Design a protein with these regions (language model features):
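Helix-turn-helix
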Residues: 15, 23-57, 61
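Amphipathic alpha-helical packing segments from all-alpha helical-bundle domains
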Residues: 68-71, 119-149, 156-160
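Hydrophobic/aromatic-rich alpha-helical bundle segments in the mid-to-C-terminal region
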Residues: 106-107, 145-192, 204-210
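Amphipathic alpha-helical segments used for helix-helix packing
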Residues: 86-90, 99-123, 171-175
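Hydrophobic alpha-helical connector segments
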Residues: 57, 61, 72-105, 158-162, ...
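N-terminal intrinsically disordered/low-complexity leader segments
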Residues: 1-11, 204-210
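Generic hydrophobic, amphipathic alpha-helix propensity
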Residues: 12-20, 37, 62-66, 70, ...
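Short amphipathic alpha-helical elements of helix-turn-helix/winged-helix folds
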Residues: 18-23, 94, 98, 165
């Protein structure tokens, strides 16, 4: 068995994850073979198993990296917003853009492939992943619900609602007839406007009602 330095191990593992990302994006999980990945990285199959126990474990690594990158992008976008209302709008715009442009993000959020894969892993494989806990998705929902103008007080409800919205915007592409549907970006804007307005109490309107 070939022995690698720590630097080489880090490099090869990164190359495997990147090659896996490209192949899984292009062909999907089922049609991608370990041989395809090892040929892309120019290593033998036996070397692959020094880094990952199975194709499933490689796919988990790919999806986890995509998840972490998504969280970083959303966090950066939200951090640049000036108000909670702008934070929600920016978060939704970023999520919608990512789901439409990145098939792996769509599979991660809409199809929940990461959790489905984790459920299929052996106990020892799941234990090996326990040392790398996931980032907190939509953690700012905990802060939003503390805002007096925010309509809901349950952050889990907010997170689940956002996931449902992302599913809705992705699924509309699957059911619409070509040439008859509204431009997706226009639909997204209308949906985001409606959601943002619905999540926050209109202080002026409430004052008038009183």
């Amino acid at each position: 068995m070939t022995r690698f330095s720590d630097e080489d191990r880090e490099r090869i593992r990164g190359e495997l994850v990147e090659a896996g990302r490209e192949l899984f994006t292009r062909h999907g999980f089922e049609r991608t073979r370990i041989k395809d990945v090892t040929e892309a990285v120019d290593i033998g199959t036996s070397t692959f198993y020094q880094f990952f126990d199975s194709k499933e474990m490689l796919y988990v690594a790919v999806l986890k990296r995509e998840r972490d990158r998504l969280i970083e992008r959303v966090d950066a976008a939200v951090a640049a917003a000036a108000t909670p209302r702008e934070e929600v709008r920016t978060m939704l715009e970023t999520l919608f853009d990512e789901v439409r442009s990145d098939p792996l993000i769509s599979r991660l959020i809409v199809e929940n492939e990461l959790q489905a894969l984790l459920d299929q892993l052996s106990e020892s494989e799941r234990e090996s992943l326990a040392a790398d806990p996931p980032g907190e998705p939509l953690g700012y929902a905990d802060r939003w619900v503390e805002e007096p103008s925010f309509r809901f007080d349950d952050p889990d409800l907010v997170r689940d609602a956002v996931t449902s919205l992302v599913f809705t915007t992705r699924s509309q592409e699957l059911v619409r007839e070509p040439g008859t549907a509204t431009e997706p970006a226009r639909v997204d804007r209308a949906l985001i406007d409606t959601i943002v307005d619905g999540l926050f109490v209109d202080a002026a309107g409430e004052a008038a009602a009183e």
